Curated annotation (Swiss-Prot):
Its main location: cytoplasm. It catalyses: IMP + L-aspartate + GTP = N(6)-(1,2-dicarboxyethyl)-AMP + GDP + phosphate + 2 H(+). Substrate binds at residues 298-304. SMART domains: Adenylsucc_synt. One of its GO terms (molecular function) is magnesium ion binding. Plays an important role in the de novo pathway of purine nucleotide biosynthesis. Catalyzes the first committed step in the biosynthesis of AMP from IMP. GTP binds at residues 12-18, 40-42, 304, 330-332, 413-415. The lineage of its organism: Bacteria, Bacillati, Bacillota, Bacilli, Lactobacillales. Homodimer. This is Adenylosuccinate synthetase. Belongs to the adenylosuccinate synthetase family. Pfam families: Adenylsucc_synt (PF00709).
Amino acid sequence: MPSVVVVGTQWGDEGKGKITDFLSSNAEVIARYQGGDNAGHTIVIDGKKFKLHLIPSGIFFPEKISVIGNGVVVNPKSLIEEIAYLAENGVSANSLRISDRAHVILPYHKKLDFLQEEAKGDKKIGTTIKGIGPAYMDKAARVGIRIADLLDKEIFEERLRTNLEVKNREFVKMYDSEPLEFEEIFEEYYEYGQQLKKYVTDTSVILNDALDAGKRVLFEGAQGVMLDIDQGTYPFVTSSNPVAGGVTIGSGVGPSKISKVVGVCKAYTSRVGDGPFPTELFDEVGHQIREVGHEYGTTTGRPRRVGWFDSVVMRHAKRVSGLTNLSLNSIDVLSGLETVKICVAYERSNGEQITHYPASLKELADCKPIYEELPGWSEDITSCRTLEELPEAARNYVRRVGELVGVRISTFSVGPGREQTNVLESVWGV
């Protein structure tokens, strides 16, 4: 029962969709286990870009099953739009399966997300205003509406009416905002549920049956370890658990059935929104990396903050997600730089060096990155297909990253295309 988990090891946008798409060729089932349509991944097939937010990357393989697990919060409207977008581009969603236990994002979640963020003033977290956080809040408070509830007209009506009464009081009294109308939401979202009904099932059964039958299952994470609500840069995090441990909760598959964990990272670092970022660059080098790497959010369109590769962050990701392999992306973006840097440790203001990532943001603010500087390379490496074809400086950079993180590099990428992802070691054993 081979199974592989793909996790982002930084602050998201590491190229998980690309690696998941690449690994999907040897998988038979591909599953999302957390997050919602706040995450975006771009996949390039035959030079054409596809941007997905909810549907797993495996949807491009019609013979494979694509699963949206119970740990995902689903915006039915967004999901239907994504299915239509794929259909317009000749991609069928017939192989899609949606967990009946997944929770639903409703208009009051998005409205509350916006109002809460606005109320924070200059202390905003940088949410995508997709309603993700409020949906997970309702789930934890045991008042959420699940896909199974959405499909049952009587249950959906009862729970929506109850929830909307509470939310509307909050909108009016706490935020001085207009209430939402019940009938409009009820009719619209019940119809969405009926459109999605043919995809809905108990996905835990599908996943476990597949694994028990010896089929290869790929679990696709959203965001990254540093955005994990427990292990990330709290409170500048998402509302779910992107770490590998989130798979068991968000898919209904036990931990004994997980074989390998592939951490995906870029050869540099990026993040969207507010929060600590020790190696962030504000100079011309940072601007060059952003423009060459097209570092703008798939979901928000916001320019991403960029910085040097941080091995302190990566070792944290290795530890809390149990990484067995590493996929190193976007090495080509660093081409043309005279020198490249890797953060190897942090230094406190008192001169003490630390090699772990602090939980306290105050402690983190007192730290400065300690860099190891390596020679850069000027060559265009986008057509390189083996490690040996890379210029010596690029080859040394890749090796040094593996040494500092302490994880075997199984693939390296020199561009966005499938053909630009190069295998050093198969995680499937094939």
